[in-house]
Amino acid sequence: MTIMRKNHPLLKLVNDSFIDLPTPSNISSWWNFGSLLGVCLVMQILTGLFLAMHYTSDTATAFSSVTHICRDVNYGWLIRYLHANGASMFFICMFIHVGRGIYYGSYMLSETWNIGIILLLTTMATAFVGYVLPWGQMSFWGATVITNLLSAIPYIGTTLVEWIWGGFSVDKATLTRFFAFHFILPFIITALVLVHLLFLHETGSNNPSGLNSNSDKIPFHPYYTIKDLLGVLLLLMVLMILVLFFPDVLGDPDNYTPANPLNTPAHIKPEWYFLFAYAILRSIPNKLGGVMALILSILILALFPLINSSKQHGLVYRPITQFIYWIFIANLLILTWVGGQPVEYPFTMIGQVASIMYFSIIIIFMPIASMIENDILKLHY
C-alpha cells in the first residue's frame, strides 16, 4: 500500500517540506531560528487577530480601546503583551537568523538570501505601522518623525508624505490606513516565507562546515522536528517570563500617555529593534543623507554574495574574518545602545564612529580579510 502523505497532492507538499526533507546531518542549533520565526509569525497573526476584534482604529477611541482590551476583555492583557513582546522575540530570532547566515556563508544561496532581505524589510514595515496603533505619545511622534523622513526625497517628498498621512498631519486617516497595512502585511509575509522556503528547498540547507553535504543527509522528521521543538519550548519560556513578569521592560513609558500633537516627548525613539538603524539615521547631519544611510543599513546585506571573494564557505576556518565579524556584532550592539540615548555629546560622536564602522566592516575590512586568508591558503597549499 502506498503511503498517503507521499501521494496526496496537498500532503505531498507538507511531506517534502517538513517530513521527508533531506537535511544535512550536522546542522547546529543556529539552524533552529528559521522554525522559531515560523512559530513567532503564527503566534503574532493569532494574537493580532484577537486584538483586532476589540481594537478601534479611530483617533478618539484607539487609546481607550487598548485600555479596554487590557482591563475588560478576558485575558486581553495577556493577548496584548504576548503580541507586543512576541514582536521583540520575532526580531531577536530574525537578527540571529541573519547573523548565522553571515557567519556560515548562507548568503551564497542568493535567491533565498534576497527573499530574506525583502522579508526583513516587510517585517520592519509591519512592526512600524503596528507601533502607531495604540495611539500613545511615542506612537504618534514616532509616526510623525519617521514618515516625515520621506519629505527628504527631492521634488515629490512633501506630496508623498501628505499622501501617506491622508492630510497635512498624522491624524485619523493615517491611523486607519496604518491599521489596514498592519492587518494585511503579515499575510504578505506568510506568502514571502513560502517563497523563501521554496528557494531554500531548491538548493538544500547550508551546514556549519560549509562543505557539500549531499552524501550525508537525514530526514527532517523525527530528528529535526524534535530538535526544533526544544527551541520552541525555550522560546516560549523566555517569552512567558517577559510577558508575565516584565511586560513593559522593552516598551516606552511615554506610550502610556495618550497622543498629544501639542506636546512633544523629550526623546523620540522607536522600539529597541530599530535603534541600530535609527542611530545610523541621526549620525548623518543631512536629512537626505541620513535617510539613504538608513535604507542602505539594511540593503547592504544584498552585497554579501557580490563582495564575497573567499575560497572557503563561511567563517568556521577563517580566524581573521571571525574576529572582524564579532567586532561587527559588538558595533551593532553599540549602535542599538546609542540609538536610545539623547542627541548630545558624547553619544552623537559614538554614533558617527559606529555608523562608519558598520559600513566599513562590510565593504572594506571583510573583503580585505578574505584576500589575506586566500593568500595564507596559497602559502600552505
Curated annotation (Swiss-Prot):
A ubiquinone binds at residue 201. Its cofactor is heme b. The cytochrome bc1 complex contains 11 subunits: 3 respiratory subunits (MT-CYB, CYC1 and UQCRFS1), 2 core proteins (UQCRC1 and UQCRC2) and 6 low-molecular weight proteins (UQCRH/QCR6, UQCRB/QCR7, UQCRQ/QCR8, UQCR10/QCR9, UQCR11/QCR10 and a cleavage product of UQCRFS1). This cytochrome bc1 complex then forms a dimer. Heme 1 (or BL or b562) is low-potential and absorbs at about 562 nm, and heme 2 (or BH or b566) is high-potential and absorbs at about 566 nm. CDD domains: cytochrome_b_C, Cytochrome_b_N. Belongs to the cytochrome b family. It is a multi-pass membrane protein. GO terms for molecular function: metal ion binding; ubiquinol-cytochrome-c reductase activity. Pfam families: Cytochrom_B_C, Cytochrome_B. Its main location: mitochondrion. It comes from the Eukaryota. GO terms for biological process: mitochondrial electron transport, ubiquinol to cytochrome c. InterPro entries: Cyt_b/b6_C, Cyt_b/b6_C_sf, Cyt_b/b6_N, Cytb/b6-like_sf, Cytochrome_b, Cytochrome_b_C_euk/bac, Cytochrome_b_N_euk/bac, Di-haem_cyt_TM. Component of the ubiquinol-cytochrome c reductase complex (complex III or cytochrome b-c1 complex) that is part of the mitochondrial respiratory chain. The b-c1 complex mediates electron transfer from ubiquinol to cytochrome c. Contributes to the generation of a proton gradient across the mitochondrial membrane that is then used for ATP synthesis. The gene is MT-CYB. PANTHER family: CYTOCHROME B. It is found in: Mitochondrion inner membrane. Binds 2 heme b groups non-covalently. Heme b b562 binds at residues 83, 182. This is Cytochrome b. The chain crosses the membrane at residues 33-53, 77-98, 113-133, 178-198, 226-246, 288-308, 320-340, 347-367. GO terms for cellular component: mitochondrial inner membrane; respiratory chain complex III. Keywords: Electron transport, Heme, Iron, Membrane, Metal-binding, Mitochondrion, Mitochondrion inner membrane, Respiratory chain, Transmembrane, Transmembrane helix, Transport, Ubiquinone. It comes from Phyllotis xanthopygus. Heme b b566 binds at residues 97, 196.
